[in-house]
C-alpha cells in the first residue's frame, strides 16, 4: 500500500530509495509522505514542469506550504552558491549550459563546510529527490553531500534513464544507488491507467516492465489488451503506415503523442513527418532550442537586408508548409515587389515589403503572423514558430536591447513557463516527452528503439498504445 510506503519514507532517518515505475503515483507518494512530516522538507527535481506538478499535487492533498520547499536541483544549487560567493567560489548568476557542471561541483564543495550544513539543517529536516534517473553523476555527488546530514529519499525509475548529458553521464544505479542507499520499497499499482479506465493496459505494461528488467522479449503476437494495437508493416511501407495511423487519430480532440527514439537522427524524422502531415500533427523541439538560436545568430550577422530576408524565408519554411506558394517570385528573391491586381496574397507581399524597407523586429513579427494565417500555409513546427514569435515580442517590448539577448531571456523564461504549444496532436522523441502523459501513444518505428526508449514510449499513453514495426519480438 502506498500509504504504508509514505509513512516509511517519512520515518526514514538515513538514506534510501524507492523504485517508481512510470505512471505508478510517485508524485502522490511524495505528497503523502511530506504531509506526514513534522517539519519542512526540501524536494528537488529537474524541471520547472516537475516543480509545478509537485506543487499542484501538494495543494490537492492539503499539504501545508510550511511543510516543504520544492525546486529544481539547478536553481537550488545556484541560489545556495550565490548566497555564499566567497565560500563557494561562484558568482555567475546565469550559467551557460557548459558551466552547470562546475556549479554543481562548487555546491558539493560548499555542502562539505560545517557552517553551510548547519544553515541547511536549520531550514529543512529532510530531503526528497524526484526523477532520480535524470540525475547526472555530478548532481548525484551533490545529493550524496546532502545525504550526509539530511535524511534523504531518492525516487525514480532506472528503466527511464535516457537523458543525454552534454558533459557528464547519468547516475549508474548499480554502482552509485543500490549499494549505498537502502531500498525503501517499490510502487506497484499502475494508477495512470486505472484512472484512465484502462486497467488492462496498465497491467500489461507492468508485465512488459518485468520482462524488460529480466532481459526478455515482448511477443506482439501473444494476446494483447484491446487498447494495444500492433500495426505490422514491411520496411518499405513504414512511412505509409505511419501516415495512415496518425490520420486515424485526427477524428477526436484527445491528446496524441507519436514517438521516435531519442537519438539525434530521430529529431529530423519528427519534423519531416509533421511536414508530411501538413501540420495536423506538430513536432516539438528540444528544450535548448538550438535551431532557433542558430537562426537568430545568423540573422543578426547578415550584411544586407536582402540576405537577412532570404534567411527569414528559409527559417519560415522550417516552420510552415506552403511558404513559397504564398510569396511572389520577387519576394522569394528578397526584393521589394510592386503590388499588382494579380497579386494573390497582397497582405503577405505588403508585410514582406515592410520588412525589406525597414528590417525591424515588429515588421518581422508581422510578416510571420501574416504567413501563419495565410490559407496556403500550415504550421508544422509550432513549437519553433511560437518560440520565435515570443522572442520577437520580448525585443519589440524593449525587455532586451538585441535579438540575441531576447533569445537568451526567452530561453530562461521558457524553463519556467514550458513549451509555447497547446496543440493536441504531437510528434516527438522519447527524450523530449519523458515524464509526460497523453491519451494515446503511437510508436512510429518500434524496431529502432532499445529497451529503455521502448519502455518510455510505451508508457506515455493512458488510454491506448499503437506499435508500428516489422518484427514480432521487442526490443528488436
Where is each model-derived feature located?
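The feature marks helicase ATPase cores and/or their adjacent C-terminal helical subdomains
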Residues: 1-476
Amino acid at each position: 500500500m502506498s500509504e504504508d510506503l509514505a509513512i516509511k519514507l517519512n520515518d526514514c532517518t538515513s538514506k534510501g530509495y524507492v523504485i517508481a515505475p512510470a505512471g505508478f503515483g510517485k508524485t502522490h507518494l511524495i505528497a503523502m509522505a511530506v504531509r506526514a512530516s513534522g517539519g519542512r522538507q526540501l524536494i528537488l527535481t529537474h524541471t520547472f514542469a516537475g516543480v509545478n506538478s509537485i506543487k499542484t499535487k501538494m495543494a490537492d492533498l492539503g499539504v501545508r506550504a510550511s511543510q516543504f520547499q520544492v525546486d529544481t536541483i539547478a536553481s537550488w544549487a545556484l541560489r545556495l552558491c550565490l548566497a555564499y560567493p566567497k565560500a563557494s567560489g561562484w558568482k555567475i548568476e546565469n550559467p551557460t549550459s557548459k558551466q552547470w557542471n562546475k556549479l554543481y561541483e562548487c555546491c558539493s564543495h560548499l555542502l562539505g563546510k560545517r557552517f553551510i550544513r548547519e544553515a541547511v539543517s536549520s531550514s529543512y529536516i529532510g530531503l526528497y529527490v524526484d526523477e532520480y534517473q535524470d540525475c547526472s553523476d555530478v548532481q548525484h555527488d551533490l545529493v550524496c553531500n546532502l545525504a550526509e546530514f539530511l535524511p534523504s529519499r531518492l525516487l525514480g525509475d532506472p528503466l527511464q534513464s535516457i537523458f543525454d548529458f552534454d558533459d557528464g553521464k547519468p547516475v549508474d544505479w548499480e554502482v552509485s544507488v543500490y549499494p549505498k542507499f537502502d531500498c525503501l520499497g517499490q510502487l506497484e499499482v499502475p494508477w495512470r491507467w486505472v484512472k484512465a479506465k484502462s486497467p488492462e493496459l496498465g497491467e500489461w505494461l507492468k508485465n512488459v516492465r518485468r520482462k524488460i528488467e529480466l532481459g526478455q522479449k515482448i511477443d506482439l503476437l501473444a494476446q494483447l489488451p484491446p487498447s494495444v494495437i500492433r500495426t505490422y508493416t514491411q520496411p518499405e511501407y513504414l512511412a505509409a503506415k505511419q501516415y495512415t495511423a496518425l490520420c486515424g487519430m485526427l477524428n477526436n480532440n484527445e491528446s496524441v503523442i507519436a514517438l521516435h527514439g531519442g537519438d539525434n537522427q530521430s529529431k529530423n524524422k519528427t519534423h519531416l513527418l509533421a511536414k508530411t502531415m501538413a501540420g495536423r500533427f506538430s513536432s516539438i523541439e528540444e528544450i535548448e532550442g538550438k535551431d532557433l538560436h542558430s537562426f537568430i545568430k545568423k540573422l543578426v550577422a547578415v550584411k544586407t537586408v536582402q540576405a537577412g530576408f532570404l534567411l527569414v524565408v528559409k527559417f519560415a519554411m522550417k516552420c510552415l508548409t506552403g511558404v513559397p506558394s504564398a510569396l511572389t517570385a520577387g519576394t522569394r528573391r528578397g526584393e521589394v515587389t510592386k503590388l499588382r491586381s494579380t497579386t494573390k496574397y497582397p497582405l503577405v507581399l505588403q508585410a514582406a515589403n515592410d520588412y525589406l524597407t525597414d528590417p525591424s523586429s515588429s515588421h518581422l513579427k508581422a510578416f510571420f503572423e501574416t504567413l501563419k494565417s495565410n490559407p496556403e500555409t500550415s504550421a508544422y513546427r509550432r513549437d519553433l514558430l511560437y518560440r520565435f514569435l515570443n522572442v520577437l515580442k520580448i525585443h519589440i517590448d524593449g525587455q532586451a536591447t538585441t535579438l540575441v539577448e531576447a533569445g537568451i531571456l526567452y530561453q530562461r523564461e521558457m524553463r519556467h513557463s514550458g513549451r509555447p504549444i497547446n496543440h493536441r496532436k504531437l510528434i516527438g522523441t522519447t527524450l523530449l516527452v519523458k515524464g509526460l502523459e497523453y491519451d494515446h501513444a503511437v510508436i512510429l518505428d518500434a524496431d529502432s528503439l532499445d529497451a529503455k526508449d521502448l519502455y518510455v514510449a510505451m508508457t506515455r499513453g493512458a488510454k491506448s498504445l499503437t506499435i508500428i514495426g516489422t518484427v514480432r519480438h521487442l526490443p528488436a
